[in-house]
C-alpha cells in the first residue's frame, strides 16, 4: 500500500496555497492544515482525489503547544490503493465535525471528546463514548495519571461489618477512583437516545445474544425499531493509556486481551507496526510461522462466529460441530505458545519459540480433514430454508456504506469491496502465498456468512503453503532476529551468554530506544482492519499509541441497519458484524 502521490500533493497545493503544508516521514505522508481549512481539505480529498474510505480519526495531546490538541485523520483511496494523513490543531479545544462527510466519524469523534475533551462543532449528538455522562476527567490527556484520580472515599470492611474505625489490616488505599452510580447510567441512557416512539427497550449489557457487555437501546413502535444507539465502555480498560506508559515489547500481552478470540492476529498487527518503526527485519522462518498461526487463528475465530451465530438463530448442531474443530486448533496453539487464548506468542523480531516437535504433522492432519467439515457446515446451513429466511436481504450494506463508515474485513468484502490488507499491504509471508479474496454481491447477512465460510477455505490454502515452506527450511533456521539491538534475546541465550544477558537487561529496563517519528500500519484481523498509529518522540516508550479497531467501526453501522426492522433481526444482524467487546472497548 502506497502513501499519497505527487500529483495529489500538487493539486492540493494549487487549491489551498499556503493554508496546507505537505509533510513526509520515513513511514507516512500527509498534510498539515489550519483549523479553518480542515473541512474543505477533507472534502476536497474525498470528492476530487477519491479518498473515499474513512480509516480513523484521533487526537494527540501536546500540553506545551498553545493549541494543545492536534486532530489526526487517516483516509484511504481504494482506486489508487493509497493512504493519506491529515493533521490540524484544535482552536480553543474545538474541531469541526466531519460526520456529514463520513458517518463513521461519529463514534471516532465521540471517543476523542471522551478521552481528550475536544469538542466537535456540528456533531449530531456529542456524548461520551466509553465513560459515563457526568464523568469530569479526560483520561488520554497527558496530565491524567495512569492510576486515575482517587477522589471517592470508601469505608474499610471492618468499619462496614463491625463499626470499628481502627486501621484495617491490609494496605489498600481507602480512596478510589469514581465508579458510575445507577443515576449516572440512567443519565447516560437518556443522553444517548431521545425517545420518539412508544417504548425504549434495553438489550444488554448482560444478554447472551450480545456476546459481550454491549448495551443496545431500541426505540420501538410495536416490534419495529424506529431508532437505536449503542453504549460501550463496560469493558474499557484504557489500553491506549497503558501503551503510552509501557515499553514497546511490554504491550504485546495487552494486545491479546483486545480481540481475545484472535490473539495472534492482534499481536501480528502490533509487532509489524513496531518493527517498521524500529527497522527490525524478521527472519523467513518467523514470517511463515506467523502467517500459519494467524490463519489458524482466523479459522478459529470464524468457527466461533459460525457456531454462536447459528445457535442464536436456533441451529444447535452447527454450534457443536464448529467447537469440535475449534478445539483442535486451540490444542495446536497451546502446544506451541503454552496458552489457548492469550497466547503472547509473537515477539518484536520474530516469535517466542521455534515450532514444537510434531507441530507440522498435526497441522497437516487438520487441514486435510477440515475441508470435509466445512462441507458439513454448508450442508446444514447454506440451503436451509429457515437460515435463508433469517439472513437473506437482512442488513444490506452498500459499497458506499463501506467507505463512509470505515468498514473492513468480511463486513466490507460481503458488500463486494475487495478490501483485504493481506493483498493490498502484504505483511508476514502473505506476499509469498497464493489465495483468493471472496466477495459478496448483495451485502446482506447471508453474503457475510458466505464470505466467512469461503475465507476459512482460503485460510486452509495459505496454511498448506506455509507448511510446505517450513518443511523445506533447515530445522535450525533462525526464528528471531537476535542481532538487532531492540530485540530481546531468547531466555536460553540470556542464561548462558553474558552479552545476551546485558542486552536483555538494557532493553527490559530502558526500552527499545525508538527513533522520533510516526507510523501507521494495520493487519487483517478476522474482524477487519486492526491498525496501530504510533507517534514517537524517541526513547523506549511511545508518546501516543492509537488503536484503530475494525470491530468498533463495523459495529458503528448497526443503528442504521436495524432501523425499520424488527427486534428478531437484531440477533442475526449483530452476529453478522461479529464484534468482540475487548476490541471495541479496548
UniProtKB/Swiss-Prot annotation:
Family (UniProt): In the N-terminal section; belongs to the complex I 30 kDa subunit family. In the C-terminal section; belongs to the complex I 49 kDa subunit family.
UniProt key word Signal: no
Name the record gives this protein: NADH-quinone oxidoreductase subunit C/D 2
EC number: 7.1.1.-
Keyword line: Cell inner membrane, Cell membrane, Membrane, Multifunctional enzyme, NAD, Quinone, Translocase, Transport, Ubiquinone
Principal location listed in the UniProt entry: membrane
One GO CC annotation: plasma membrane
Location of region: NADH dehydrogenase I subunit D: 197-586
Enzyme class: translocase
Region (NADH dehydrogenase I subunit C): 1-173
Protein localization: Cell inner membrane
Protein's job: NDH-1 shuttles electrons from NADH, via FMN and iron-sulfur (Fe-S) centers, to quinones in the respiratory chain. The immediate electron acceptor for the enzyme in this species is believed to be ubiquinone. Couples the redox reaction to proton translocation (for every two electrons transferred, four hydrogen ions are translocated across the cytoplasmic membrane), and thus conserves the redox energy in a proton gradient.
Membrane topology: Peripheral membrane protein
Assembly and binders: NDH-1 is composed of 13 different subunits. Subunits NuoB, CD, E, F, and G constitute the peripheral sector of the complex.
UniProt keyword DNA damage present: no
HAMAP family: NDH1_NuoCD_2, NDH1_NuoD
InterPro entries reported in the protein's UniProt record: NADH_Q_OxRdtase_suD, NADH_quin_OxRdtase_su_C/D-like, NADH_UbQ_OxRdtase_30kDa_su, NDH-1_subunit_CD, NDH1_su_D/H, NiFe-Hase_large
Catalytic activity reported: a quinone + NADH + 5 H(+)(in) = a quinol + NAD(+) + 4 H(+)(out)
GO molecular function, one term: NADH:ubiquinone reductase (non-electrogenic) activity
Domain of life: Bacteria
Amino acid at each position: 500500500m502506497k502513501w499519497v502521490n505527487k500529483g495529489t500533493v500538487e493539486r492540493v497545493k494549487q487549491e489551498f496555497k499556503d493554508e496546507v503544508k505537505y509533510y513526509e516521514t520515513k513511514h507516512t505522508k500527509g498534510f498539515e492544515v489550519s483549523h479553518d481549512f480542515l473541512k474543505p481539505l477533507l472534502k476536497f480529498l474525498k470528492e476530487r482525489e477519491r479518498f473515499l474510505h474513512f480509516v480513523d480519526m484521533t487526537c494527540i495531546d501536546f500540553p506545551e503547544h498553545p493549541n494543545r490538541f492536534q486532530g489526526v485523520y487517516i483516509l484511504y483511496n481504494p482506486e489508487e490503493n493509497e493512504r493519506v494523513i491529515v493533521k490540524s490543531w484544535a482552536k480553543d479545544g474545538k474541531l469541526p465535525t466531519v460526520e456529514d462527510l463520513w458517518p463513521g466519524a461519529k463514534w471516532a469523534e465521540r471517543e476523542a471528546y471522551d478521552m481528550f475533551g475536544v469538542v466537535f462543532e456540528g456533531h449530531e449528538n456529542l456524548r461520551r463514548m466509553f465513560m459515563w455522562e457526568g464523568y469530569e476527567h479526560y483520561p488520554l490527556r497527558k496530565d491524567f495519571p495512569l492510576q486515575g484520580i482517587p477522589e471517592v472515599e470508601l469505608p474499610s470492611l471492618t468499619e462496614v461489618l463491625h463499626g470499628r474505625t481502627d486501621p484495617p489490616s491490609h494496605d489498600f488505599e481507602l480512596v478510589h477512583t469514581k465508579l458510575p452510580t445507577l443515576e449516572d447510567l440512567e443519565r447516560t441512557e437518556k443522553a444517548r437516545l431521545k425517545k420518539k416512539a412508544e417504548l425504549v427497550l434495553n438489550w444488554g449489557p448482560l444478554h447472551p445474544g450480545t456476546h459481550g457487555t454491549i448495551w443496545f437501546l431500541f426505540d420501538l413502535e410495536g416490534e419495529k425499531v424506529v431508532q437505536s444507539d449503542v453504549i460501550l465502555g463496560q469493558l474499557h480498560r484504557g489500553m491506549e493509556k497503558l501503551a503510552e506508559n509501557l515499553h514497546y515489547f511490554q504491550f504485546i500481552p495487552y494486545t491479546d486481551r483486545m480481540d481475545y478470540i484472535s490473539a495472534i492476529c492482534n499481536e501480528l498487527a502490533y509487532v509489524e507496526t513496531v518493527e517498521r518503526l524500529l527497522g527490525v527485519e524478521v527472519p523467513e522462518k518467523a514470517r511463515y510461522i506467523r502467517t500459519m498461526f494467524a490463519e489458524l487463528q482466523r479459522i478459529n475465530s470464524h468457527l466461533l462466529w459460525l457456531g454462536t451465530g447459528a445457535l442464536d438463530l436456533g441451529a444447535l448442531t452447527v454450534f457443536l460441530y464448529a467447537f469440535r474443530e475449534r478445539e483442535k486448533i486451540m490444542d495446536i496453539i497451546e502446544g506451541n505458545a503454552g496458552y489457548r487464548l492469550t497466547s503472547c506468542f509473537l515477539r518484536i523480531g520474530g516469535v517466542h519459540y521455534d515450532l514444537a516437535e510434531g507441530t507440522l504433522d498435526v497441522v497437516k492432519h487438520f487441514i486435510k480433514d477440515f475441508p470435509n467439515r466445512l462441507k458439513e457446515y454448508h450442508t446444514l446451513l447454506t440451503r436451509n430454508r429457515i437460515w435463508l429466511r433469517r439472513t437473506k436481504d437482512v442488513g444490506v450494506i452498500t459499497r458506499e456504506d463501506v467507505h463512509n463508515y470505515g468498514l473492513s474485513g468480511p463486513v466490507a468484502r460481503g458488500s463486494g469491496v475487495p478490501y483485504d490488507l493481506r493483498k493490498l499491504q502484504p505483511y508476514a509471508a502473505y506476499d509469498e502465498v497464493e489465495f483468493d479474496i471472496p466477495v459478496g454481491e448483495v451485502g446482506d447477512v447471508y453474503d457475510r456468512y458466505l464470505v466467512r465460510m469461503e475465507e476459512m477455505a482460503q485460510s486452509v490454502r495459505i496454511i498448506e503453503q506455509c507448511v510446505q515452506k517450513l518443511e523445506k527450511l533447515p530445522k535450525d533456521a533462525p526464528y528471531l532476529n537476535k542481532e538487532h539491538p531492540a530485540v530481546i534475546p531468547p531466555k536460553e541465550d540470556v542464561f548462558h551468554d553474558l552479552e545476551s544477558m546485558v542486552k536483555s537487561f538494557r532493553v527490559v529496563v530502558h526500552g527499545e530506544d525508538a527513533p522520533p517519528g510516526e507510523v501507521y500500519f494495520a493487519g487483517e484481523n478476522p474482524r477487519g482492519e486492526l491498525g496501530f498509529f504510533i507517534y514517537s518522540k524517541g526513547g523506549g516508550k511511545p508518546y501516543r499509541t492509537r488503536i484503530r479497531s475494525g470491530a468498533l467501526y463495523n459495529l458503528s453501522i448497526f443503528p442504521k441497519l436495524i432501523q425499520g426492522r424488527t427486534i428478531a433481526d437484531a440477533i442475526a444482524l449483530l452476529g453478522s458484524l461479529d464484534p468482540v467487546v475487548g476490541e471495541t472497548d479496548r
